[in-house]
């Protein structure tokens, strides 16, 4: 899947709040079941995003999987969701496990996530310090479409 060729991404409009609630929520539940503490800072989101739901889920699943491999379970995972200036941002930060042991990694997962986000018109930024790892996803956001007959 990784390479120069484009992925077969099919963008569709989604209510960002509903999609994030479901997809991010699934990852949070999985991590909590593994003993992680999640600290959420979720601002009210009222926008529409264009994503390929299956590929977006793949990005979020990869992040949750990486956290379960590399994050220190004794420290909280921070999840921030914000909507500002025409963009939706999801930021996930964790403390790095000091001795992860024998964990296979070729970092292809993160590169694929970056490619998926770029093809969906967004960004995937990762930052690592000595003890923290942070990923920030951004997607262009549009106002929610008002259904016919609805008033704001």
Residue locations for each model-derived region?
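A conserved beta-strand-to-alpha-helix junction within the catalytic ATP-binding
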Residues: 10-25
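Conserved micro-motifs of the catalytic ATP-binding
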Residues: 4-9, 48-51
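Short helix-loop "hinge" at the ATP-lid/N-box region of the Bergerat-fold HATPase_c
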Residues: 66-68
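Glycine-rich/acidic phosphate-handling loop/turn and adjacent ATP-lid/helix
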Residues: 90-108
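Conserved catalytic submotifs in the C-terminal HATPase_c
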Residues: 10-12, 32, 37-47, 95
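Short beta-strand/loop element within the Bergerat-fold HATPase_c
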Residues: 74-86
């Amino acid at each position: 899947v990784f390479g120069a060729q484009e992925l077969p991404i099919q963008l569709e409009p989604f209510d960002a709040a509903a999609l994030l609630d479901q997809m991010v929520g699934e990852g949070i539940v999985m991590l909590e079941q593994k003993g992680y503490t999640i600290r959420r800072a979720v601002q009210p989101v009222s926008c529409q995003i264009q994503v390929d739901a299956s590929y977006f889920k793949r990005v979020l699943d990869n992040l949750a999987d990486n956290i379960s491999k590399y994050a220190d379970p004794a420290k909280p995972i921070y999840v921030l969701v914000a909507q500002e200036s025409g963009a939706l941002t999801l930021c996930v930060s964790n403390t790095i496990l000091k001795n992860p042991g024998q964990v296979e990694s070729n970092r292809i997962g993160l590169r694929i996530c970056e490619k998926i986000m770029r093809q969906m018109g967004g960004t995937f930024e990762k930052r690592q310090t000595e003890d923290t790892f942070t990923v920030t996803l951004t997607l262009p956001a549009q106002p929610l479409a008002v259904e016919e007959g609805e008033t704001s």
